[in-house]
Amino acid sequence: MTNKKFKLAAMSLATAVAVSAVGPSASAVTYQLEKGDVTVGQDGTGAYSYQNQTDGKTDNVYVDQDTQNNGQIIITQAEGTKTDNTVTVEEDVTNEKGKRDVDIILDGVNVDTSDTSTSTDTPAEVPADTKEDKTIIKVGEGANVDLTVKDSNLTTGGNGIDIGVNLKDDDDNKETNVDLTLDNTNINLTEKDNTAGIVARDHSKVEVTLKGENTIDGKEALEDAAQEAEDAKKEGMSSPNRNVEGIRVGGENAGDDSSGEGASLTIKGDETSDQGSLNIDHTSTGMVISNDSDVTLTDNADVDIKHTEAGSSTQGGRGIVQRGDLTVEDKSSLTIDTVGSGAYKIDNDQEGLVYGNNGYGIDSTDDITVTGDSTLEIKGTQSSAIYGGTGSSLTVEDSTLNIDSNGRGIDYEGGAGDITFENSEVDISGNGMGISVAPGGGTNITFDNSTGSVSAQNGTAIYGPESNGKGKLTVTNKSKVKLEAPTGIYAGFDEVEISGKSKVTSIGSVGMMFVGGQSGATKLHVTGESEYNLQMKGYAHALRVNLSKNPSSILVDQNSKLHLSQATKGASAIVLGNGATLTMDNGTLITEGKFL
């Protein structure tokens, strides 16, 4: 939160000494949550709190008048008990004119609002207002508070923590600011119909600090959806869309829609101790970043998204649906593991859930930036690890990217932006393609002072746009890149440049297929003491320069090297089409092995 108040400014020295001697927890206003719901509100006097107990409402305790403990609102629970009571921060609670921030601490609570039973039956669908009632922590729009949830279990039949809620039914698009600390806390989702562990609604700014190990788990909700789908199938019916999301940033609730307005979520590690972590497990979508919203992982944050499954959700089967900027910075880590799509299945031998196929790691239409010694790792995806739609871009700087996908590694549409690796380590492994750009695309792919590999088991390591592509593939500034696939480069680029003492090693049947860029031709330029080393195996041409509409060219200059070798029996080392050229200008051409 901004504009933090100096909380001891109004205290006398004598009072400060007294507080120090007693300790803040001994004199704080403390509520036992099992005794009733807790509400934080504000009136003309300032921010206050109270509890609705069985024998009535307690007196308001004002933050500024609680001089012995700096106004902290502490909510605990008797050990061994469970409650369905909740916490609500009303709209516009800021204590803006007071001396202290509104500081709410839930410590050791065990809340379960998952019971949806009635006297007759369990409803197939929980009404929206009922789900809101079952949300455990609600912060109204326009509020500005600190919120800590420590050593707690939140099992919810609605959302876990919902920020920026329109509680008065007169949505004014007010900005909401929350500093949220998660400290060894578990959020368990049990409702299958449009719920999330953490929601930052439109116009919310939320900073999450992670301490210890924290979890958002939707397994119970997904199993319920799986059973629903099985039952519907038996009846010859389709099951309704179900969205169980780990985190939703922007919009007004979880669901198929990813529209939103100006929400921002920052997830931070704990600077004072070991790295804090957040594990998001068993959801239809691990995180949704809505339009005009953004998410940043910083300060050594560690976020792990596992086991996302689509079911009948239109946005499901994705680790992240990204319609706004995603940044991983300052030694932070984002891991996405095991992403599937398709019908839910029940299998008791597989702990209830079996995952399908065709899931994306990140479904992106905006900027992904990984910087500052950070790591982005995506593995176990059944479709593309990163699917880039129109407007997307990927920048990895001074960091690490690891991709191991059963589909494509990076798959960009024609309208997608650039892919840049600078001072980074990159390891991309896909099945059909390592990096792919759709026909007519203008994506520039750059390796700048970077090392790594791009591989594809059954296709092409780097698949440029088809003919008429507008992009460029550049490997420069002492980069070392290994391509391992049946075809190394499918060059629909205008130019492929290897420069600045860089080396590209290509292992496979075909090193490069020249299919022509926007000009109808592709230029391969190996320059600046660089090397293009093609280690071929199989009966094929190492360089196919005869596929473009207009004549393509190869230029090797400035003491650079083109090295072609064949381990088995191959076709021609280089096949030139009509008008194609091969020029060695202070360059070296080496061929060895069993070429024709």
Residue map of PLM features:
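Bacterial Sec-dependent N-terminal signal peptides
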Residues: 1-14, 18
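Sec-dependent signal peptide cleavage junction
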Residues: 20-32
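Boundary/junction segments of secreted and surface-exposed precursor proteins
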Residues: 29-42
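Acidic Gly/Asp/Thr-rich repetitive segments characteristic of extracellular carbohydrate-active
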Residues: 39-96
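Beta-strand-rich solenoid/repeat architectures in extracellular/passenger domains
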Residues: 75, 79-82, 98-102, 106-131, ...
